[in-house]
A protein has these predicted regions:
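Short, surface-exposed beta-strand/beta-hairpin micro-motifs centered on an aromatic residue
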Residues: 76-83
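Structured interaction patches on ligand/partner-binding surfaces of diverse proteins
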Residues: 96-127
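Beta-strand-rich extracellular modules
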Residues: 35, 94-96
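Bacterial signal peptide processing site
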Residues: 20-22
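Short, ordered, surface-exposed loop/turn motifs in non-cytosolic proteins
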Residues: 37-64
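A short tyrosine-centered beta-strand micro-motif
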Residues: 87-93
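C-terminal motif of bacterial Sec signal peptides marking the signal peptidase cleavage site
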Residues: 15-18
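A short, amphipathic beta-strand motif
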Residues: 28-36
């Protein structure tokens, strides 16, 4: 009987550890493109929350990582979050749209379904 319990608890521990989802340790990348009415927002701060499908808050401490959206060659401003696992993520961005002289912000839920690859995501922002 004792051996069966040891085997059961060992299996349970291995199953729990191997089911890790969301966060870092994988081979996925999210390329987040912050945009306000289709206009790219360079230098916007782009935040990511692992395991979230809704906005967790608007403070930097509510998120797991942050990057600055940069213009790379002729591409629109974007930020890369690399090394992600399959799972749910929430991307939130804050920046300044010089065409309307306003601070803009917004976010979007992202689901990664594959083991590896890059997912381009437009982050819609409003005043």
């Amino acid at each position: 009987m004792k051996i069966k319990l040891v085997i059961f608890y060992t299996f349970l521990a291995v199953a729990t550890i191997s089911c890790k989802k969301n966060g870092t340790g994988g081979e996925n990348t999210i390329a987040a493109f912050p945009k306000h009415h289709g206009v790219s927002i360079p230098n916007a701060t782009v935040y990511i929350k692992y395991g979230a499908t809704e906005l967790p808050g608007q403070n930097a401490s509510d998120f797991d990582d942050a990057k600055t959206a940069v213009v790379d060659g002729s591409s629109a401003a974007h930020a890369h979050f690399e090394g992600l696992l399959k799972g749910d993520y929430y991307i939130y961005s804050v920046g300044f749209d010089s065409t309307v002289n306003e601070v803009v912000s917004g976010g979007i839920a992202v689901k990664i379904k594959s083991k590896s690859g890059e997912q381009d995501v437009e982050v819609p922002m409003t005043e």
